[in-house]
Amino acid sequence: MIRVLLADDQTLVRAAFAMLVGSDPDMEVVGEAATGLEAVALARTARADLVVMDIRMPELDGIEATRRIAADEDLAGVKVLVLTTYDTDDHIVDALRAGASGFLVKDTRPADLLAAIRTVAAGESLLSPGPTARLIARVLSAPQPPAGGGPAGPGMLSDRERQVLALVARGLNNTAIAETLGLSPLTAKTHVSRIMGKLDARDRAQLVIIAYESGLVVPAGAAADGN
C-alpha cells in the first residue's frame, strides 16, 4: 500500500486528488496539507511514502517544503512528486534541485497521475514529456564544456553512457532505453547506475539537472551544425 500525502492550498483540488488516489486499491491518502509548513509537519507524522506537492502554497512554497523534506534524515524514504499548473523551466529545475523525484502538470490524465505515483514510490524519477523536452532543448543549445574539463565533464562518460544519459534525460525508463538501444534491461540499468556514480547524482531526476547545467547531452546533429 502506497501512503500518499496531498499538499495543495485549494480545497477542491485536494478533494479531487483524494478521491482519485483513494479509488486505487494500492494507495491510501494519509493526510492533506493546505500550506508548505503543514506538508513538512505531516510528512513527519503521517508516515507517508510519497507527497504530491503543489508549488504555490502559503507560508512556505512547495519547492522549499520539498527541500526541507529532502534534507530531513528522518524522512529519507519519503518521495516528492510535484504536481502544479506551472511548467516553466525554472520551476522544474528548482523542484528537482530541491529533491523532487518527479514533476507533472495538473492537466495530466488521472490514470497517468496514478501511474506517476507508482513510479516515484518505486524509486524511479518522472517528468512530464513537454517540460522535459524543453529542458533538453535548452541543454542541447547550451555551450558545451571542454571534455574532461571538470568533475562532471563529458569526458567522464563513454559514448554509450552519453546515449543512455540522453534517453534518461528525455524521461525514458530502463526498459524503454533497452529497447531503443538494443540492450537488455539489466544492461541498461547497469549503465544508468554507472552514470549516476560517475556524475555523483542522487537519482535520475538529478541527471536531468546535470545535463541541463553542464551540457552533457549532445544533439545528434550537433557536430554537423557546429554547436
Segments (PLM) and residue ranges:
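Basic, Lys/Arg-enriched C-terminal extension of HTH/homeodomain DNA-binding domains
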Residues: 196-227
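Acidic catalytic/metal-coordinating carboxylates
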Residues: 35-38, 60-67
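Short hydrophobic/Thr-rich beta-strand motif most characteristic of the beta2 strand and flanking loop
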Residues: 26-34, 42, 201
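Recognition helix of helix-turn-helix DNA-binding domains
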Residues: 171-206
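Active-site residues of response regulator receiver
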Residues: 8, 54, 84
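Active-site beta3 strand of CheY-like receiver
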Residues: 46-52
